[in-house]
């Protein structure tokens, strides 16, 4: 029986940090990476969008993210799926914000019973790797079966299709 795969992602649009400075993007680095996963392994793709959008201005967005982490916030998500029960494998894609996953990722995961589901994280960043996100997610959702994640430099996401695709295929085998 073939695995039922869901790739979820949160990706920031607007001003984004790159090694050579702040740039304005219409498509975030994490969205690019999530699309590569979807292309490689199929299944369904779901973008996590908050009811109250994050600022498109880099510094304001950083302050919003820090405030959410500091208060353990769970921002409301738009258009949540009624159920994720058909899926046994879920790729969880996010940028490293304040050393962990954005709190909207937790908002999504809090909504569902993850018992026995295989969760596979992918984290975009500009040098901080996965940060504490893998540990934090495993601690918050211990009933899931967590697989080793992949750290992708955000500015290299667009040129990482082969690496991401091969990792995704290996992760579900």
Feature locations, PLM:
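N-terminal beta1-alpha1-beta2 submodule of the flavodoxin-like/Rossmannoid cofactor-binding fold
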Residues: 1-89, 99-100, 162, 166-172
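Structural beta-sheet core signal
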Residues: 7-9, 45, 92, 121-123, ...
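Soluble non-cytosolic domains of exported or imported proteins
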Residues: 24, 28, 99, 127-131, ...
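C-terminal lid/capping helical subdomain adjacent to the catalytic/cofactor pocket in oxidative enzymes
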Residues: 40-44, 93, 152-155
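A short, structured active-site edge motif that brings together acidic residues
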Residues: 49-51, 121-125, 148-154
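Helix-loop-strand module that forms the ligand-binding subsite of alpha/beta enzymes
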Residues: 55-145
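Glycine-rich phosphate/pyrophosphate-binding loop and the adjoining helix
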Residues: 145-173
């Amino acid at each position: 029986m073939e695995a039922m795969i869901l790739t979820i992602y949160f990706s920031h649009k607007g001003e984004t940090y790159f090694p050579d400075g702040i740039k304005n993007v219409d498509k975030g680095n994490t969205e690019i990476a999530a699309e590569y996963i979807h292309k490689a392994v199929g299944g369904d793709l779901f973008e996590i969008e908050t009811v109250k959008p994050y600022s498109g201005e880099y510094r304001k967005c950083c302050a919003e993210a820090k405030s959410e982490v500091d208060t353990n916030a769970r921002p409301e998500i738009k258009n949540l799926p009624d159920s994720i029960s058909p899926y046994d494998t879920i790729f969880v894609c996010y940028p490293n914000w304040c050393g962990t996953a954005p709190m909207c990722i937790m908002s999504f995961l809090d909504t569902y019973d993850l018992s026995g589901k295989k969760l596979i994280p992918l984290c975009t960043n500009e040098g901080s790797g996965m940060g504490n996100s893998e540990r934090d997610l495993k601690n918050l959702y211990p009933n899931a079966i967590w697989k080793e994640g992949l750290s992708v430099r955000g500015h290299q996401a667009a040129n990482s299709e082969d690496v991401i695709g091969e990792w995704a295929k290996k992760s579900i085998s």
